[in-house]
């Protein structure tokens, strides 16, 4: 009997709509983002998914997406676990910048490397930057040394994996059906881990907002199959839109 896991990237955020790097900045959803989250819930309901537990990050765009989706699923009562380890990749000094302007300044190739490569970090924020996570009380209990000032996808995976191993994998091993509402890069990190994707191939993996990605896993949590729910052509188009966000006009 397979275990079921759904990865759901948050719906469109206000900075997604403005094509800005977001990272750990706590930006809310647009109205379209709320609609995407609700539609995701309907797609999961049509699939007949009955979850036992849900996980999300400490950022409201993922939290609100989960709330909207669970409401549409009529599964609002589910236990929800939140962890900073599911936060988006920290984009360092790129956070808040327009992606097209950044591509025009640094070149599309460089921006694509920053956005989609596995082990290359963007420039870091300074320690005295007002947006440094150490100034945010939601991270007050954490050792300052673990708070990022920039991250590559590799760093993000290293951050996410302990939570997978300690919290999520044991639930799947207990035959629980699990929903994770998180972010483009924290989910890309999990996608890479689950599919044993190469460092090169992950460059071309783009996860669209608000479309549930259903994994079926074996009893050893190996991938049996995975697919986006709903129209596969719509998911492909949405993935291509994500890929094009860092291109200069």
Swiss-Prot record:
InterPro entries: His_Pase_superF_clade-1, His_PPase_superfam, PG/BPGM_mutase_AS, Phosphogly_mut1. SMART domains: PGAM (SM00855). The active site is at 10 (tele-phosphohistidine intermediate), 88 (proton donor/acceptor). It is an enzyme of class 5 (isomerase). The keyword Isomerase applies. HAMAP family: PGAM_GpmA. This is 2,3-bisphosphoglycerate-dependent phosphoglycerate mutase. Signal peptide: none annotated. Belongs to the phosphoglycerate mutase family. BPG-dependent PGAM subfamily. Substrate binds at residues 9-16, 22-23, 61, 88-91, 99, 115-116, 184-185. Pathway: Carbohydrate degradation; glycolysis; pyruvate from D-glyceraldehyde 3-phosphate: step 3/5. It comes from Xylella fastidiosa (strain 9a5c). Disulfide bonds: none annotated. GO terms for molecular function: phosphoglycerate mutase activity. Catalyzes the interconversion of 2-phosphoglycerate and 3-phosphoglycerate. CDD domains: HP_PGM_like. It holds the Pfam family His_Phos_1. GO terms for biological process: gluconeogenesis; glycolytic process. Homodimer. It catalyses: (2R)-2-phosphoglycerate = (2R)-3-phosphoglycerate.
């Amino acid at each position: 009997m397979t275990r079921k896991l759904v990865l759901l990237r948050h719906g469109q955020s206000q900075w997604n709509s403005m094509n800005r790097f977001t990272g750990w900045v706590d930006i809310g959803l647009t109205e379209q983002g709320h609609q995407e989250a609700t539609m995701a819930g309907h797609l999961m309901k049509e699939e007949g998914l009955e979850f036992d537990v849900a996980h999300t990050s400490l950022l409201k765009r993922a939290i609100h997406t989960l709330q909207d989706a669970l409401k549409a699923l009529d599964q609002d009562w589910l236990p929800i676990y939140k962890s900073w380890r599911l936060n988006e990749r920290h984009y360092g000094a790129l956070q808040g910048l327009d992606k097209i302007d950044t591509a025009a300044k640094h070149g599309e190739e460089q921006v694509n490397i920053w956005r989609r490569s596995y082990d290359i970090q963007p420039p870091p924020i300074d320690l005295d930057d007002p947006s440094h996570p150490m100034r945010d009380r939601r991270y007050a209990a954490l050792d300052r040394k673990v708070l990022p000032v920039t991250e590559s996808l590799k760093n993000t995976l290293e951050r996410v994996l302990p939570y997978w191993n300690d919290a999520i994998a044991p639930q799947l091993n207990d035959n629980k059906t699990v929903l994770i509402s998180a972010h483009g890069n924290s989910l890309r990190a999990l996608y890479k881990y689950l599919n044993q994707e190469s460092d090169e191939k992950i460059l071309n993996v783009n996860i669209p907002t608000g479309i549930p990605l259903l994994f079926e896993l074996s009893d050893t949590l190996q991938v049996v199959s995975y697919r986006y729910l709903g129209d596969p052509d719509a998911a492909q188009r949405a993935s291509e839109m994500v890929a094009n966000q860092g291109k200069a006009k």
